[in-house]
A protein has these predicted regions:
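Solvent-exposed loop/turn segments at secondary-structure junctions
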Residues: 67-71, 96-100, 133-134, 146
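N-terminal "domain-start" segment that seeds a small globular fold
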Residues: 29-50
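Structural micro-motif
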Residues: 112, 116-127
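Typically the conserved alpha-helix immediately C-terminal to a functionally engaged Cys/Sec
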Residues: 73-85
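Thiol-based oxidoreductase modules, predominantly thioredoxin-like and allied folds used
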Residues: 87-108
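Short active-site neighborhood of thiol/selenol oxidoreductases, capturing the structured segment around
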Residues: 56-67
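N-terminal secretory signal peptides
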Residues: 1-13, 17, 22-28
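Non-catalytic, surface beta->alpha helical segment in thiol-disulfide oxidoreductase systems
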Residues: 128-161
Length: 164
């Protein structure tokens, strides 16, 4: 036989309610815990950003992204954000955004106008720029298989370094 408690004092109910609320709160936090969202700095002055990259003997990597793009988020999280933390100069241009930016000629334009000028229609797209704002490696367009994204990215970086 099971012993059923018969103590229904207010203190017992408060203790039980507190335990239930604590457990629900903790389980909700664990359930909805998400890794920190990886972000890249928005392009503001392409000539300055290019100069920093070339100083590091690297091409400037520009990621063209679109708000809500799952593949863009995966590329940032898995590859681009860690590279940026290790010193690679990477900036983001947001398709369909009117955020101001200086283009390679020093003219004020917008992120959306740059994506049109560069004829980018797929996100994510990675562009690799060298001296004079010229593309120095083949673009990476769209999503790649996760196991191959890193090697393809390293290959493009090697192409870009050779062109410097």
């Amino acid at each position: 036989m099971v012993d059923i408690p018969t103590d229904y004092s207010p203190q017992t109910w408060r203790r039980r309610d507190w335990l239930l609320l604590s457990g629900a709160s903790l389980s909700g936090r664990l359930l909805y815990a998400q890794p920190a969202v990886a972000t890249l700095p928005a392009a503001q002055s392409l000539p300055e950003e290019l100069a920093r990259a070339i100083k590091n003997k690297q091409p400037l990597i520009v990621m063209v992204s679109l708000e809500g793009c799952v593949f863009c988020r995966q590329a940032r999280q898995s590859h681009l954000s860690p590279m940026q933390k290790n010193g690679t100069v990477i900036v983001q241009v947001d398709m369909r955004q009117n955020q101001p930016v200086l283009d390679f000629a020093g003219k004020l334009t917008t992120h959306d106008q740059l994506t049109r000028l560069w004829r980018v229609s797929i996100t994510p797209t990675l562009l690799f720029f060298g001296p004079g704002g010229k593309e120095v490696a083949e673009r990476m367009e769209g999503a790649y298989l996760p196991d191959f994204y890193g090697p393809y990215l390293e290959d493009r970086l090697a192409q870009g370094r050779q062109a410097l």
